[in-house]
Amino acid sequence: MAKLILVTGLAILLNVQLGSSYQLMCYYTSWAKDRPTEGSFKPGNIDPCLCTHLIYAFAGMKNNEITYLSEQDLRDYEALNGLKDRNTELKTLLAIGGWKFGPAPFSSMVSTPQNRQTFIKSVIRFLRQYNFDGLNLDWQYPGSRGSPPKDKHLFSVLVQEMRKAFEEESTLNHIPRLLLTSTGAGFIDVIKSGYKIPELSQSLDYIQVMTYDLHDPKNGYTGENSPLYKSPYDIGKSADLNVDSIITYWKDHGAASEKLIVGFPAYGHTFILSDPSKNGIGDPTVSAGPPGKYTNEQGLLAYFEICTFLNEGATEIFDATQEVPYAYLGNEWVGYDNVRSFKLKAQWLKDNNLGGAVVWPLDMDDFSGSFCHQGRFPLTTTLKRDLNVHSASCKASYRGEL
């Protein structure tokens, strides 16, 4: 018995010292600081002990070179990277691209070897100048949205050339190599059109898969934003609109499990019901829901805004089939995630030996704790706890600077 207690104690001690093998990545969006009053979120509001990686969204591109989008970005870079003073194990990445950025600048950049080298050299200079630890390529998407079919191959070429350049720069200067990650699509047709998965998996450090935005108001019926499993109403191609099917596809087609980072949304999609009495999954809708008070985007509510919706009397239902909740009040309907669904997904992630989780975005979690009354960052904290993510070097706590 004494020997068993000793072994158990050593295992616990080693776990505390070495930390989790899972990554917990968190996006910070540059426009979050512009939200009104209690919804405004700045780099100083970030708890430096919460995530293993912070990803700043987004940088831009000009003449095939990476660039900042505003002078304020430069101040944000300094504040974000200053968090590493309080957590020496924290890594920061700069994301380039995004949905609004579109595929055209990427398509032009990858089209010639000269353009690719111009971009790669600019990335190394830029990341080192502003003290980032790596890059997140958020091209939405190679081979789709007007991007030609050849971009599927050229994206792999870019990633291979960039990884090689990062390694050479590291060796030459005797410094840690820059990290290289890519956002990965969550729709099977887009994945097929855009990615040579085995090649990408070999060169990338991580692939952050967008396992969200799987149902939205454009569909004309209610559906969950990020269901873990399929609904009985999901037939045909819709049967793949769930986290389990998407990640399984990536794994089955050549992605290393430990490099797959599962997307966890800190927001939900909202709908206006055609008939308020028909308020389940798959019921007809007429439009997107009204914009949130703070996020001001039609068809979307941040998690902290959803808590207000619930506090106003909305009925919350937990869909045991898809393992995510939805809620409705009158003709308004929202499909989202909460602490319970994050816990279930975290366990599923561990059961499948995946690399970790990425929260999009951190600034839509209840960062102040004043809306949901579940503590600060309740969704992200759930992942931190359930994935056993911690940093022995991090002594600073959340200070909530403005």
UniProtKB/Swiss-Prot annotation:
One of its GO terms (molecular function) is chitin binding. It comes from Mus musculus (Mouse). PROSITE patterns: GH18_2. The gene is Chil4. GO terms for cellular component: cytoplasm; extracellular region. InterPro entries: Chitinase_II/V-like_cat, Chitinase_insertion_sf, Glyco_hydro18_cat, Glycoside_hydrolase_SF, Glycosyl_Hydrlase_18. One of its GO terms (biological process) is carbohydrate metabolic process. Residues 22-390 form the GH18 domain. Induction: Up-regulated in response to IL4 and IL13 and during the allergic response. Keywords: Cytoplasm, Disulfide bond, Inflammatory response, Secreted, Signal. Residues 1-21 form the signal peptide. This is Chitinase-like protein 4. Belongs to the glycosyl hydrolase 18 family. Chitinase class II subfamily. It is found in: Secreted; Cytoplasm. Its main location: secreted.
